[in-house]
Amino acid sequence: MRLAVGALLWISLNVAAADAPVRFVMADSWAMPMVQLDRGRPTQGILYDIMLSLATQVGVPAEFHVLPRARVQGAMEHGEVDVRCYAAQSWLPNQSGDYIWSIPLFLQRDLLVSRQGPPASIVPASLKHESIGTVLGYVYPTLQPLFDNGQLQREDARNQEQVLDKLLVGRYRYAVTNQWTLDWFNQRLMPGRQLQAVAVLQEQNVGCYVRNDPKVPVQRILRTLLRMKMSGEIDDIIGLYTGAEPRTP
């Protein structure tokens, strides 16, 4: 009898472990096409679709935690969440904890954009006393010396879409965005009103990292991400939202 009870308990524990969700973290400053947040819950977007497909292929439920950007890394360190995507190791110089990184999955391409693109590209250092649309809390290494010496001024918004909305209505002449967001934003505008890239500020490969914990199916997650990248699934999801051919790392 005790053997039977023990066997049932072992089965129950293993079923519970198999059903444990993978907890993904998202920053509340993200906007489309990365993710659409409705009342604090993700409903669509590139990263939402990728995370949902990843969990399905791993065979576990997906659980989404939407947090202020400043709390994201702390949540990883304290074991409140398991997976963070769209990050680079260079963004986390003081990262503490045991993590395993995926291969590069995306190309982060930061652009300086304007309402009317001039005939030639702009050198940011040539700009004087301009307000630049930026996202609150984001760091822009190429522009930081110009912000520090007062040559340029930041004008922060809560997320990338708000930054571009303000540019479109003329709050400032230039803003920083990434290629995904620019492609998404321009899809809703007539050709004559579309925002134009005037400088490439930075290109960087980014991926996901997973908390290295026995309770987390780390290797299954990493293998699945590799398969999704190699099969073209990730690039197909990007193209679905941006309408553009993705730039592969």
Regions found by a protein language model. Name each.
Residues 61, 139-152, 158, 226-249:
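Ligand-binding clefts/hinges and TM-proximal coupling segments of bilobed small-molecule sensing domains
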Residues 28-30, 106-111, 187-226, 245-249:
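Periplasmic-binding protein-like
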Residues 70-82, 125-126, 161-180, 188:
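Short helices/loops that flank or line small-molecule/ion binding pockets
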Residues 61-68, 152-166, 199:
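Short beta-strand-to-loop elements that line the ligand-binding cleft
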Residues 114-132:
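Flexible hinge/capping segments at coil-to-helix
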Residues 18-97, 134, 156, 221, ...:
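Extracytoplasmic small-molecule ligand-binding "clamshell" domains
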